[in-house]
C-alpha cells in the first residue's frame, strides 16, 4: 500500500546518516525531516509521514542478533534477518564488525515495512572499521 504526502516538498527525507566508532561498536545514527517514528503502530495501518527505519549493513550480511543486538533479534522475529535490522529509534549499534570497508543503507518505511517511494527516503554511507 502506497501512502503519499501532501507534496514532494514535504516527503519523508533522510537528511544524514553518520557512524561513530567506539571500542568494538559502530553506532549508526540517522537524521530525518518530514518523518516521525511511530513505534506503537508498526505492523498496523500506514500513516503519511510516519513509520520506522530499516538499516541494511553490507546488504544485510550483518543484520543478525550477533551484530545488531536487539534490532537483530527483532529482525529474526519478523523473519527478515540477513536482509535488514528494523528500528523504532534513529540509531542502531553494531558490534563485532570485522575490520575493513562497510556500507550501510537506511530506509524510511511505512508501518507495514514497505519503503517510502521517494528517492530522498533512503541514504547510503560507506565507512571503514579500523
State each model region's role:
Residues 8-26, 31-35:
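Short, compositionally biased P/S/T/A/G/V-rich stretches that sit at domain boundaries
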Residues 3-6:
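N-terminal signal peptide c-region/cleavage motif recognized by signal peptidases
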Residues 25-37, 43-130:
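Long, low-complexity serine/threonine/glycine- and acidic-rich segments characteristic of extracellular
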Residues 15-16, 41-43:
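Short secondary-structure capping/turn segments at boundaries of alpha-helices and beta-strands
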Amino acid at each position: 500500500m502506497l501512502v503519499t504526502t501532501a507534496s514532494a516538498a514535504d516527503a519523508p527525507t533522510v537528511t544524514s546518516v553518520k557512524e561513530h566508532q567506539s571500542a568494538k561498536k559502530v553506532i549508526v545514527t540517522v537524521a530525518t525531516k518530514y518523518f516521525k517514528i511511530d513505534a506503537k503502530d508498526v505492523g498496523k495501518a500506514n500513516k503519511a509521514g510516519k513509520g520506522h527505519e530499516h538499516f541494511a549493513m553490507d546488504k544485510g550480511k550483518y543484520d543478525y542478533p550477533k551484530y545488531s543486538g536487539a534490532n537483530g533479534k527483532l529482525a529474526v522475529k519478523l523473519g527478515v534477518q540477513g536482509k535488514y535490522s528494523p528500528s523504532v529509534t534513529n540509531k542502531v549499534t553494531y558490534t563485532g564488525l570485522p575490520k575493513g570497508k562497510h556500507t550501510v543503507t537506511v530506509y524510511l518505511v511505512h508501518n507495514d515495512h514497505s519503503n517510502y517511494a521517494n528517492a530522498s527516503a533512503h541514504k547510503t554511507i560507506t565507512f571503514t572499521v579500523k
